[in-house]
Amino acid sequence: MAAVSGMRRTRTVSPTRWIVYAGSVFAGAWLATQLFYLVQIALWSFINPGSTAFMRTDAWWLSRDKPPAQVQHQWVPYDQISRNLKRALIASEDSTFATNNGYDVDAILQAWEKNKARGRIVAGGSTITQQLARNLFLSREKSYIRKGQELIITWMLETVLDKERIFEIYLNSVEWGRGVYGAEAAARYYYRIPASRLGAWQSARLAVMLPKPRWFDAHRGSAYQAQRAAVIARRMGAAELPQSQ
């Protein structure tokens, strides 16, 4: 009897309790990640981002080239970027950018149908703000989980920043080729001029590149690029630029 009473009982934890515990840890980590994103975006109201997730990934790979290379990137203020380029990007990437809330529901639904038909993710229906969310924080991976996070960050950007600031950060961080980021670096890389001097045709050709900048960098002067640039050039006059608030 004494031996029995001296034995310590082993407490078992029910599977339900483990599930609740694991769920709490996951939820806490998820909320902490969202808070990190939100704080970063709030800081960018008055501080320019030093780099993006895409830039850091490229910098890692470029450092392993032989000889090692570096990311080309130079921040320039919004008013030092050609209005031609601004109009070309809006005409090409997001015609309702100045007035939308960061989402294009019709484009998202069309992308969903296309992806379902192909059996894989081939389109995203992303607005300029969604592209910026991906460039700043996420990866090039195509998945519905990443898309969901992109939509949340898009809401944060649209809530905290005005449209002109969103566009300024986008213009300075979008990729235009392997290791080439932002309007200033692109203008100097492709045309050897500052972004402030980009003409309408040069801007239209740069806008064409954005869906596949590395492919177009390797296939400069393709017939498709010229044809698509002509279409964008015709639409540029109707492109509405955002106004600062």
Swiss-Prot record:
It is a single-pass membrane protein. It catalyses: [GlcNAc-(1->4)-Mur2Ac(oyl-L-Ala-gamma-D-Glu-L-Lys-D-Ala-D-Ala)](n)-di-trans,octa-cis-undecaprenyl diphosphate + beta-D-GlcNAc-(1->4)-Mur2Ac(oyl-L-Ala-gamma-D-Glu-L-Lys-D-Ala-D-Ala)-di-trans,octa-cis-undecaprenyl diphosphate = [GlcNAc-(1->4)-Mur2Ac(oyl-L-Ala-gamma-D-Glu-L-Lys-D-Ala-D-Ala)](n+1)-di-trans,octa-cis-undecaprenyl diphosphate + di-trans,octa-cis-undecaprenyl diphosphate + H(+). One of its GO terms (molecular function) is pentosyltransferase activity. The chain crosses the membrane at residues 20-42. Signal peptide: none annotated. Belongs to the glycosyltransferase 51 family. This is Biosynthetic peptidoglycan transglycosylase. The lineage of its organism: Bacteria, Pseudomonadati, Pseudomonadota, Betaproteobacteria, Burkholderiales. The gene is mtgA.
